[in-house]
Amino acid sequence: MIEFVKGTIDYVCPQYVVIENGGVGYQVYSPNPFIYQINKQETIYTYHYIKEDAFSLYGFQTREEKALFTKLLNVTGIGPKGALAILASGDPGAVISAIEREDEAFLIKFPGVGKKTARQIILDLKGKLADVVPEMIGNLFNHEDHIQVETQQTALDEALEALSVLGYGDREIKKVYPLLKEEKNLTTDQYVKKALQKMLK
């Protein structure tokens, strides 16, 4: 079991990053790959997902993120893609709060989460997340933003592609596109977070 990979970011795309360590490139799926910068040294905490002939690595910036991902995977009806979409919201505190309040309306805003799955999330996780994110709730994903040299349109296009990978449909993406166009000088990571904030209102 690989607890984490420490190395240099070699490649970033909407689905995953490649981190190189000892001449080996590890393909790691991430909630928002654009938080990473190419050629930068990083430590990614990994989770192995094995199902039949599928073997995948999922990676997170903190052990707390990884623990929350693991908890979500234990919920019937939630797979890796669904768990990543929930984590990509950038506000785990709001997710945990919704679970504790039994706020199904908030949870069904995530791709692939219907009323039945939302109810299952609440049944399985309510009262069981305090050990996952102690005093870090609310600030868990507020990492220092990376400064990237990229044009605004390129960043926006990459963000829209990332939203599609997370499972959001064309209708939802088109709805937030005009709002994102009004934002200036944002990185891809910031565009994704801004879009998810607007979608989850």
Swiss-Prot record:
Where on the tree of life does the source sit, at the highest rank?
A: Bacteria
Region annotated Domain I sits at 1-61
Task: Show the Pfam families listed in the entry.
Answer: HHH_5, RuvA_C, RuvA_N
Task: Name the UniProt key words of this record, in alphabetical order.
Answer: Cytoplasm, DNA damage, DNA recombination, DNA repair, DNA-binding
Give the start-end ranges of region Domain III: 151-201
What organism does the UniProt record list as the source?
Bacillus pumilus (strain SAFR-032)
* Gene that encodes the chain: ruvA
Q: Name one GO cellular component term.
A: Holliday junction helicase complex
Asked whether the keyword Glycoprotein is assigned, the reply is no
Q: Please report the name of this protein according to its UniProt entry.
A: Holliday junction branch migration complex subunit RuvA
What does it do?
The RuvA-RuvB-RuvC complex processes Holliday junction (HJ) DNA during genetic recombination and DNA repair, while the RuvA-RuvB complex plays an important role in the rescue of blocked DNA replication forks via replication fork reversal (RFR). RuvA specifically binds to HJ cruciform DNA, conferring on it an open structure. The RuvB hexamer acts as an ATP-dependent pump, pulling dsDNA into and through the RuvAB complex. HJ branch migration allows RuvC to scan DNA until it finds its consensus sequence, where it cleaves and resolves the cruciform DNA.
Region annotation (Flexible linker) maps to: 141-150
Instruction: Tell what the record comments on domains.
Output: Has three domains with a flexible linker between the domains II and III and assumes an 'L' shape. Domain III is highly mobile and contacts RuvB.
Task: List GO molecular-function terms, semicolon-separated.
Answer: ATP binding; four-way junction DNA binding; four-way junction helicase activity
Describe the protein's quaternary organization and the partners it interacts with.
Homotetramer. Forms an RuvA(8)-RuvB(12)-Holliday junction (HJ) complex. HJ DNA is sandwiched between 2 RuvA tetramers; dsDNA enters through RuvA and exits via RuvB. An RuvB hexamer assembles on each DNA strand where it exits the tetramer. Each RuvB hexamer is contacted by two RuvA subunits (via domain III) on 2 adjacent RuvB subunits; this complex drives branch migration. In the full resolvosome a probable DNA-RuvA(4)-RuvB(12)-RuvC(2) complex forms which resolves the HJ.
